[in-house]
Amino acid sequence: MRHMRPLIALSLAGLMTLSACGEDVAAKDDSAAGSSAAGGSNNSAPAKDGGSITVRGCTPQNPLIPSNTNETCGGNVLDAVTARLIHYNPDTAKPEMDIAQSIETKDNQNFTVKIKPGYKFSDGTKVKAQNFVAGWNWAAYGPNAQQSGYFFEPIEGYADEQCGDEACKTKPKVKTMSGLKVVDDHTFTIKTTEKVSNLKVRLGYTAFAPLPDAFLKDPTNKKWEKMPIGAGPYKVTDNTATAITVAKNENYAGAYQGHVDKVTFKIYNDASPAYNDTVANNLDINDLVPTDQLTNDQWKSDLSGRWAIRQSGINQTLTYSGKDKQLASNKDLVKALGMDLSLIHI
């Protein structure tokens, strides 16, 4: 019988998310108790280094480019593949220095960033200040139509990089933001249009990951969409319609080294097949419990001794389609529906 163990090798935000309950559910080693209460500690046994595991994945909605991935399916993969200036502690969510050696400011508008020497991308090239500055300029450039391009809006000159119209028939004034300057290989500066007190915290978002020289020289090459080059603890080795596999990045120089050698994100676009595979021990880690298994905590019985719960911050919204003419033209009806919905039952 294959043992289930916690995926502590990857920094996957919301790794074990219990749908609609605001809690995290994680598979645990069989030797550990599987009944920790919500908000309780995770008492799973220590995972051993090496080997491989399978994790529930889903089809990325966009290419695996840091600034173009803003959903969980692709985000979980890029969390393993990329390193950023800031790393979020998986237990406390507090920002910690990763590639950044220091981020200093006296006025929350002018920032000096120094990066640690020795970091490399998975292709063996060095991570330099230019990889951040050029990468951010490319990501913010309107014609590149990046899903997360708006993350760079606080930086001076962002507006000048945007298209003059929705169809982008009027090209931007510039291709680089005036608020970004390379000082040397390990130093660059950021100037924002106004004071931004939490900029340091934001710099851990995937969109701010540095882009390698190979990408910057040929950004339209389709291979980057499925086989990204990052500076994180893992690298993508295979990407198909049914699975995305990442293996340890031998060039990784950071403090967040992975424990397992290989992780395969098996693609499931429905919660039930993934759940059934988990129960049958054909899937090691699953972060989603089907709603029909939540009744009477059926999933706890099915996965006895192999689960854990922890608190998680989840933002959920309920909206209606703008194409629904009846709702779009009747604000009172929308309000009535909202008042009728009981949050207790959602």
Question: Where are each of the predicted segments found?
Answer:
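Extracellular/periplasmic solute-recognition and catalytic clefts
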Residues: 237-247, 264-328, 336
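Aromatic- and charge-enriched surface segment that lines or borders ligand/interaction sites
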Residues: 101-151, 189, 280, 327
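Secretory targeting and sorting signals
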Residues: 1-25
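Gly/Pro-rich hinge or "lid" segments in bacterial periplasmic/extracellular proteins
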Residues: 186, 192-257, 262
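N-terminal lobe/hinge region of extracytoplasmic solute-binding protein
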Residues: 56-107, 229
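Bacterial lipoprotein signal-peptidase II cleavage site
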Residues: 21-35
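Surface-exposed binding/hinge segments that line
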Residues: 104, 140, 144-213
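Alpha-helical secondary-structure segments
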Residues: 128-137, 185-191, 232-233, 260-262, ...
